[in-house]
A protein has these predicted regions:
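A short aromatic-anchored loop/beta-hairpin motif
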Residues: 44-228
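Positively charged N-terminal leader segments that act as targeting/secretion signals
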Residues: 20-29
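Residues flanking N-terminal targeting/processing segments that define the start of mature chains
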Residues: 5-9, 13, 25
Length: 228
């Protein structure tokens, strides 16, 4: 008798990987665990799992200092490449100080931190905010969550800041096929984006909370070698 009946999920991965990935994409969360001889190629990951908006959750073995224990909101993904914002990496710069350096006044809690959004274009500001405001260089990410990427947009938002607003310097970028390769090699877990985690008041908790939402104990992931 075939052992596939004992392990129906593993059997489905091997016998019908496309069907399995489609089901996974619509589940509450999904953890892609690669293994030798995997039959799901990168194009399946590209088309089914990596549609924005999505959370990319770094595994503990990802030791790149730009992404160690990071949670990335994937905001754009196409055949040409991908763009994301690291949502849980505050830096020692307050939003009031940053706005003052740009000749603006922040009319909200000026002590909240600026965040490092990624290693690309770190001199450029990106603003995630929950509002109905349609401003210049602003795109809808999900629901009322919008991403603005110009100082003109920021100048409009700081006058009457919405309850949920975070400012990031830089973004995370991947070239053609690069992100899918990193996912299949086990550097990232993939999960649906969660608005509450994006604007979580304590960014130090975001990584563990994101894993717990997937039903994963972080300690269970800490027993293998590093991923670069």
């Amino acid at each position: 008798k075939s052992d596939s009946n004992k392990f129906p999920i593993i059997s489905e991965i091997w016998l019908n990987p496309l069907s399995f990935l489609k089901k996974a994409a619509f589940s509450r969360s999904f953890c892609l665990v690669p293994f030798p001889g995997s039959r799901y190629p990168n194009f399946m990951i590209e088309r089914i799992l990596l549609g924005a908006p999505t959370f990319l959750i770094a595994v503990p073995q990802l030791v790149d200092p730009n992404f160690f224990r990071s949670v990335v909101l994937l905001v754009e993904h196409s055949d040409e490449g991908s763009m994301g914002i690291v949502v849980n990496r505050p830096i020692e710069l307050e939003i009031g100080e940053f706005c003052a350096s740009q000749d603006m006044t922040f009319n909200g809690d000026a002590t909240q931190p600026i965040f490092q959004g990624g290693p690309v274009q770190t001199d450029r500001a990106f603003i995630l905010h929950e509002s109905e405001q349609e401003g210049p260089e602003t795109e809808t990410v999900m629901g009322n969550i919008r991403l603005s990427y110009s100082l003109e947009s920021l100048s409009m938002l700081v006058e009457e800041p919405p309850e949920h607003l975070k400012v990031f310097l830089g973004y995370a970028g991947w070239g053609e096929g690069q992100l899918a390769e990193e996912v299949t090699t086990g550097a990232w877990l993939v999960a649906p984006a969660d608005v509450q985690l994006i604007f979580q008041s304590n960014p130090d908790d975001v990584w563990e909370l994101a894993l717990h939402q997937m039903g994963i104990d972080p300690l269970q992931l800490m027993h293998s070698g590093s991923v670069h």
